[in-house]
Design a protein with these regions (language model features):
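All-alpha prenyltransferase/terpene-synthase fold signal
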Residues: 1-233
């Protein structure tokens, strides 16, 4: 939907085959997943329907932006929860459901998935500004005028310079201005604020694992939290 040419370091479907094929491919995947889930019972179908609903709501909210007196930072985090957290939560819930664990454990694993999904997107927000080796060109979101968490914190800071505030209020297509904005953001307190929020979501994911019995799966999930949280360090 954002016409991005690269997704996770790989050429995007819409860039390679065009929007029509990309959209229809997504529709096909949803249809095929519904067909597979139909054999697993009504609860499995319900989880998918609720997840798809959240995904669409998240995309709609991102497209229209925060409304009225809605806090842009809260809005951003809720969009990440709906667009990414919901998907990882559903994956965790399915695994727990099919393994036959208790409802309490299932909820914990789903909440772990949601938390790590949000943490992943927040690390992406940071990497867009500070990394040269993240699989995406630094400042891609800045060029497109997308307000990531560091940008939102910078705009909310009364001490942010008028020049940086002006740059962050629009898409930055000029190379010199783009480099200027990146350099200013990299030393701005907004980066530390965004890292702190990332750590909070990573800590929440770790907390959800705490009550689970020790096993290889738990160890792997704990390692996953660290790899997500610290890829932006």
């Amino acid at each position: 939907m954002d016409e991005a040419e690269v997704r996770r370091g790989t050429q995007s479907a819409n860039s390679r085959w065009g929007n029509t094929v990309a959209i229809l491919s997504g529709d096909f995947l949803f249809a095929r997943s519904s067909k597979l889930l139909a054999d697993l019972g009504p609860e499995a179908v319900r989880v998918q329907a609720e997840t798809f609903e959240r995904l669409v709501i998240g995309q709609l909210r991102e497209s229209v932006g925060p409304q009225g007196d809605e806090d842009p930072i809260v809005h951003h985090l809720e969009v990440l929860a709906d667009k990414t957290g919901s998907l990882i939560a559903a994956a965790g819930r399915y695994g727990a459901m099919m393994s036959g664990v208790s409802a309490e454990v299932t909820d914990r694993i789903a909440d772990f998935g949601e938390s790590i999904g949000i943490a992943f997107q927040l690390s992406d927000d940071l990497l867009d500004i500070e990394s040269e080796v993240s699989g995406k060109t630094p400042g891609t979101d800045l060029r497109e005028g997308i307000r990531t968490l560091p940008v939102l914190f910078a705009l909310a800071d009364p001490d942010t310079s008028p020049r940086l505030r002006e740059l962050l209020s629009r898409a930055i297509t000029d190379d010199a201005e783009h480099a200027e904005a990146l350099a200013a953001l990299r030393i701005h307190p907004a980066m530390d604020q965004a890292r702190e929020v990332l750590e909070q979501w990573a800590d929440r994911a770790r907390e959800r694992l705490g009550a689970l019995p020790n096993c290889d799966a738990k160890t792997a999930m704990a390692t996953l939290v660290d790899s997500v949280a610290y890829r932006a360090v």
